Amino acid sequence: MIIRSPEPEVKILVDRDPIKTSFEEWAKPGHFSRTIAKGPETTTWIWNLHADAHDFDSHTSDLEEISRKVFSAHFGQLSIIFLWLSGMYFHGARFSNYEAWLSDPTHIGPSAQVVWPIVGQEILNGDVGGGFRGIQITSGFFQLWRASGITSELQLYCTAIGALVFAALMLFAGWFHYHKAAPKLAWFQDVESMLNHHLAGLLGLGSLSWAGHQVHVSLPINQFLNAGVDPKEIPLPHEFILNRDLLAQLYPSFAEGATPFFTLNWSKYAEFLTFRGGLDPVTGGLWLTDIAHHHLAIAILFLIAGHMYRTNWGIGHGLKDILEAHKGPFTGQGHKGLYEILTTSWHAQLSLNLAMLGSLTIVVAHHMYSMPPYPYLATDYGTQLSLFTHHMWIGGFLIVGAAAHAAIFMVRDYDPTTRYNDLLDRVLRHRDAIISHLNWVCIFLGFHSFGLYIHNDTMSALGRPQDMFSDTAIQLQPVFAQWIQNTHALAPGATAPGATTSTSLAWGGGDLVAVGGKVALLPIPLGTADFLVHHIHAFTIHVTVLILLKGVLFARSSRLIPDKANLGFRFPCDGPGRGGTCQVSAWDHVFLGLFWMYNAISVVIFHFSWKMQSDVWGSISDQGVVTHITGGNFAQSSITINGWLRDFLWAQASQVIQSYGSSLSAYGLFFLGAHFVWAFSLMFLFSGRGYWQELIESIVWAHNKLKVAPATQPRALSIVQGRTVGVTHYLLGGIATTWAFFLARIIAVG
């Protein structure tokens, strides 16, 4: 920690009225670019308009102006998010069976969309129970609302209106902070102040207010709901907040107020701030008292963290000092210079944030099923599957985005003249060693993981089950994973003496939790089948990383194209007369990385979907006998490629393929349509530009003959544009196909 003389008191951190508000200018397409603003000569114009509209770097090189545009755009983004949330709450208020679901969440399905009968599509309104007909939703909003203590549709209306007000406020803020009071560059670069405010304000006070809401509103209301009290009889949130006696009836220590807090007699609060672990047997969700305790603890941590960085008071940590002190034995100057990179290149900053947020999103996916946070979430299998799949896809996209912006940083913002012998320079100088080793790892993993399956398929085809890798023949048990499971299952008695149960039932060690005759969670066994598919996960992840990392490390130069930096982030080839230099731009690596990200995530969600249906989800009889949805067939069927095709893809696609004429028929149509969208992508990916240009010339000739030729000249898509359209339809088609396949299946059987 370094103590410096305090900085001068008053800093002017905004410019007043920097840019006038002009609707005339905005109405002109391409106003941000001299070339595009001239209007279209060829059809390429519309593609350039879309490509460059949000590429603020191409509008100006002034970092302050770029920063203001990004800042303003963030408010626009928040406005859209509030608008979307408002729509979700409005549907809950206007078109849903929320109040009915609240009274009987085990027998009534959540629905918040009722289809209007226009051409007979009211068939989609299935019977979700309780006499309500609508589309079953799998977003988890009902469970979230119950956990928040929302007991009526009126409360949802109010929240929806509140979100609209916030959306308007955000739109105003976006305009105000660009046109009326725009922050100076120094404000965007003041990282210590930003850290303090974000840590203490957003994360600290945000968590504290949520903990407060949970203690004063959610806990008492859920206490009543769990006891079977009619939601209409339960006091309203403001009554709990204003009347301490009401709370004291449920939690006697409330009568003492804040005295135990100030007298350090904190154990008095153990009634509603618990450390139980495991799941509430009534709802199959985490104990809400544990969740409140968790948010309170998180709030304390972040409030402290938000006071650690040096600003006007000359005390605390400085980010620059921390980074420059960070030197390892093999990394030369270490992190010296990273501070300058991260305060002058928003692409570098964004890249780090995307990598961390993407990883965090995938962590969320894995916790949503192993530690289901909301009441009745664990037994809503459609929602569980949707939440896992959604967070996996989002995480995958964010991580590819991290590589994209790292490469843009390398091309546009990296200055090799000022970087010598720091961490980044060291990595770039031995990039060949990194990439060739990574390539070797990919080859090893690919041949060995796939080879295990091929061996099993061959032995199975030859009728030699005793020679297969399986739990009943040659075992390949995941011993490390089982050891980790065991360690966590035993933790309450050993490493976590304060907890009564382990963090998740998935580790093992406990009895299954069932709600309303359905399994919420049970110890998840791991065996040879999991060992095999986990190595496929390792393979696909490493290949994705290989492609993306190669794109970043060779973004500026390579042996093939030493002057790559001059060609920019995306270019088709290194000019005419240099064969074999196509698809080498940093953009192309992102393009290729997206396909492998899609491979990787697909295997993960297929593994999850089948494993849960086979070994976890199912019903339980009065005698305590569990019947799983697919009867535990994962361990023996998923060990061959044929098993995956026959017993997973084909067997479980029967619901979506046979959905016509039922309330699930929309999924059948989506399944078909999304296959078409996916196939359409191949037309762009497997075809050359010249083919289309020739075809266009011929069509233009016909138009000229008929004297209906347009003023704007038609042009074939450029190579990069064609690939963009291709990968977009490939991913969109693939994801929508998977969505229809999963949901038709799980809504029918779950």
Swiss-Prot record:
Family the UniProt entry places it in: Belongs to the PsaA/PsaB family.
Please list the GO terms describing molecular function: 4 iron, 4 sulfur cluster binding; chlorophyll binding; electron transfer activity; magnesium ion binding; oxidoreductase activity
Q: What gene is behind this protein?
A: psaA
- EC number(s) given by UniProt: 1.97.1.12
Going by the UniProt record, its keywords in alphabetical order are:
4Fe-4S, Chlorophyll, Chloroplast, Chromophore, Electron transport, Iron, Iron-sulfur, Magnesium, Membrane, Metal-binding, Oxidoreductase, Photosynthesis, Photosystem I, Plastid, Thylakoid, Transmembrane, Transmembrane helix, Transport
Which GO BP terms apply? photosynthesis
Cofactor annotation comment: P700 is a chlorophyll a/chlorophyll a' dimer, A0 is one or more chlorophyll a, A1 is one or both phylloquinones and FX is a shared 4Fe-4S iron-sulfur center.
Under the cellular component aspect of Gene Ontology, which terms does the record hold? chloroplast thylakoid membrane; photosystem I
Q: What does this protein do?
A: PsaA and PsaB bind P700, the primary electron donor of photosystem I (PSI), as well as the electron acceptors A0, A1 and FX. PSI is a plastocyanin-ferredoxin oxidoreductase, converting photonic excitation into a charge separation, which transfers an electron from the donor P700 chlorophyll pair to the spectroscopically characterized acceptors A0, A1, FX, FA and FB in turn. Oxidized P700 is reduced on the lumenal side of the thylakoid membrane by plastocyanin.
What protein name is recorded for this chain? Photosystem I P700 chlorophyll a apoprotein A1
Residues annotated for chlorophyll a' binding in this entry: 675
Please name the taxonomic classification of the source: Eukaryota, Viridiplantae, Streptophyta, Embryophyta, Tracheophyta
Which catalytic reaction applies to this protein? reduced [plastocyanin] + hnu + oxidized [2Fe-2S]-[ferredoxin] = oxidized [plastocyanin] + reduced [2Fe-2S]-[ferredoxin]
Q: Which PANTHER family match?
A: OUTER MEMBRANE PROTEIN, OMPA-RELATED, PHOTOSYSTEM I P700 CHLOROPHYLL A APOPROTEIN A1-RELATED
Binding locations of [4Fe-4S] cluster: 573, 582
Q: Domain of life, per the record? A: Eukaryota
Q: Quaternary state and partners of this protein?
A: The PsaA/B heterodimer binds the P700 chlorophyll special pair and subsequent electron acceptors. PSI consists of a core antenna complex that captures photons, and an electron transfer chain that converts photonic excitation into a charge separation. The eukaryotic PSI reaction center is composed of at least 11 subunits.
Q: Which PROSITE patterns match?
A: PHOTOSYSTEM_I_PSAAB (PS00419)
Question: Where would you find the membrane-spanning parts of this chain?
Answer: 70-93, 156-179, 195-219, 291-309, 346-369, 385-411, 433-455, 531-549, 589-610, 664-686, 724-744
Locations listed in the record: Plastid, Chloroplast thylakoid membrane
The record lists phylloquinone as bound by 692
Which species is listed as the source? Oenothera elata subsp. hookeri (Hooker's evening primrose)
- Please name the top-level EC class of this enzyme: oxidoreductase
Recorded topology in the membrane: Multi-pass membrane protein
Which residues are noted in the entry as chlorophyll a-binding? 683, 691
